[in-house]
Amino acid sequence: FVRVNKLNVKINYDDILVIESLKDYIKIITKNKNFIVHTTLTSFTESLPRNKFIRIHRSTTAAIDKIDVIDGSNAYINKLPYKIGGSYKESFKNLVVNFN
């Protein structure tokens, strides 16, 4: 559950595509809807299952099984490109090698 506009909203991990940082807030992008939540990306990412999500940029966490294409420094999710940050490339590369 996440707190959105004074309500506790249930979001299934399998519905999450990407989580983006918005300073003291995050935007949780799901298949059907986006949610703005008052928390930090680091804090929220730490609460997620590590086998399902990976930090790919200082402002982005992605659902591993939702990544469709990897093109150099971008991961494409739902046909949209998300930049893979330099300090996250090595762990991302290891994940891709181990995922296959």
Task: Tell where the protein language model's regions lie, with residue ranges.
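Eukaryotic intrinsically disordered, low-complexity regulatory linkers and tails enriched in Ser/Thr/Pro
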Residues: 1-5, 88, 93-100
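Conserved binding/recognition cores within well-folded domains
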Residues: 1-77, 81-83
